Amino acid sequence: MSAPKNEMYYSLLEWFKTLNLNAPHADAESLADGVALAQALNQFAPESFTDAWLSKIKASAVGSNWRLRMSNLKKVTQSVYDYYSDVLNYSLSDFSKPDLQRIAEKCDLGELERLLQLVLGCAVNCAEKQSYITEIMCLEEELQANIMRALQELEATRQASTPEGGVASSLSRGSRTGLLDSKAVQEDRDALAQKCFETEKKMLLLIDEKTNLQQELHKLQQEFARLEQHSTVIGDDGVSLGPVQTGSVRYNELRRQLDLLKEELLQSEGAREDLKIKAQQQDTDLLHMQMRIEELMKSSAEVTTLKDEVDVLRESNDKLKICEAQLDTYKKKLEDYNDLKKQVKILEERSADYVQQNAQFEEDAKRYANTKGQVELFKKEIQDLHAKLDAESSKNVKLEFDNKNLEGKNLALQRAKDSLLKERDNLREAVDELKCGQLSSSTALTGTTVSRELQPSATVEKLQRLEAENKALREGQGGQTALAQLLDDANKRCENLREQLKTANERILSLSHASQSDDPILKESEFGKQIKQLMELNEQKTLQLEEAVTQSTSLQCKVTQLETNLSAREQEILVYDAKYRKCVEKAKEVIKSIDPRIASALDASVLEKSADLVEEEPKPKMSVMEEQLMTSAFYRLGVNAQRDAIDSKLAILMGSGQTFLARQRQSAPRKSLSAMKSK
């Protein structure tokens, strides 16, 4: 099918093969490097395409290097355009420039055709154009017609007037020898017959004139002899003309007449010779014309036979067009069938993918359900851990506080011991003076001071009461959600810390009041230390409060993120389910368009399957997969049956020798249901 498309290219290539070039120029690959084209241009116009310019064209080591080809072709086309604009005064603005990259890379025939068209224009417009035109005239008529069409397309783009504008017309006149040959032969034969008739008439007239001149010459000779015999001659008027002697008037006149007659005789003889030569030439022309007429008669007979063959070929061409149209329709139908097959395959693959995605989404949903339970467990564990942490922290604070109290008591006891030792020394000195009553009073006083220091503080009771309330509140709020519990726990911890801070402040105040009654210096140092410790505890509690708040916010963010992910997964599952249903509906429509019988069977099977699925929704995963595989296999069976039916139709259509309408009237062969069931 590529030859009719590039008919002009092959005609131009046949003309280019007639040139005597050193470089190979037989096919498109040899022309794609531009070497043969450059040599041809140098041969056409060596004054414009000089040898120095030709040496710039790289002939060796080009091979398959398309960049070197591209550079050669650029040089050739630029020089050709310069030659057209500067030398021929042509404007090629309307002529589409050939794509050199496609020629260099792919040897494109369409672009080579335009490049050869430009080279042809250089050939028929150069100084030696007549020789190249005669070479073109020696080619076949079909090639001449294509070359003439190429020149006409090239001249249609010319905008400046040039004296070589009639080249295409001369080629067109020389190439019109097809069906008009018979008329030309008839006209030439009539013209030659008319010429022969006119030459024969001229010959007869000249022969008559020759005989008349000969008779007149004979009469003159007789008259001259008679006049020489008689001395005197009487004229027409009766007057004597005198003797014919040399020097006389009569003699001179007769002499003059004789000279005139001789000149006329010579002229008549020259004319006779000319006529004889013309007659011989006319005879030879007549023979040539007769031979030409015979040749033309033979050519007219050949033309008639060729006309008959053309008519036969025309009829066969019409039949071929009809067959090609039918073939195109069949090809389109086959392409549509292949497209439908591809679409069905794609839909099957998509349905399988959707089934896999649905299974994966189900697994993800189950996994997320498990993770949901785990998250709830983790929430409960976090709450328990927070409760334990609060209990341990409160215990730690209590122990630290008790430790500090015990240390203070120990210091107080040590001081009391020192004072007692001093008093003992004093009492030993005054043992003689003071008796047992004083000793008992002093011991009672010391016992009261010690008992006062060892009494439990009110803050410990308040802390115990607050812890009990905290535990009761935690137990009462155990039924709320995880986030609310976390927030409540954080708030409770804040309240506990605030209450502890309050109690610490109250204790500081109580201790400050107690310090006023005891030794001020020692109490201030002890209470200063306790105040510092309580401030540090306050800072630690505030830090713990902030950490608890941040942990609660982070846990809340994680829970919200997990909930959003779960909702997004559920939406994706719904979207993929809808897409799967749409694809199933499209597959049903395609199968209905292919064969409604299979489609009805498929609808019934799909309805049954859907009813079974509705009844048995909580089926295991493997049974669902088996049912989906069975439905896809049933779809594939329907497609295969339809394909076999179409193949049998095509085989019947291609094998039978009937007409297209007769084949269309026949009923399509149908396969039995038993054959389909056996498959």
From Swiss-Prot:
Major localisation: cytoplasm
> Which InterPro entries does the record cross-reference, listed alphabetically?
CH_dom, CH_dom_sf, Hook_C, HOOK_N
PANTHER family tied to this protein: HOOK PROTEINS (PTHR18947), PROTEIN HOOK (PTHR18947:SF39)
Family indicated by similarity: Belongs to the hook family.
Domain characteristics, as noted in the entry: The coiled coil domain mediates homodimerization.
* Described purpose of this protein according to its UniProt entry: Involved in endocytic trafficking by stabilizing organelles of the endocytic pathway. Probably acts as a cytoskeletal linker protein required to tether endosome vesicles to the cytoskeleton. Involved in modulation of endocytosis at stages required for down-regulation of membrane proteins that control synapse size. Not involved in synaptic vesicle recycling. Required in R7 cells for boss endocytosis into multivesicular bodies (MVBs). Has a role in regulating adult longevity.
* Protein name per UniProt: Protein hook
What is the source species?
Answer: Drosophila simulans (Fruit fly)
Q: Which gene encodes it?
A: hook
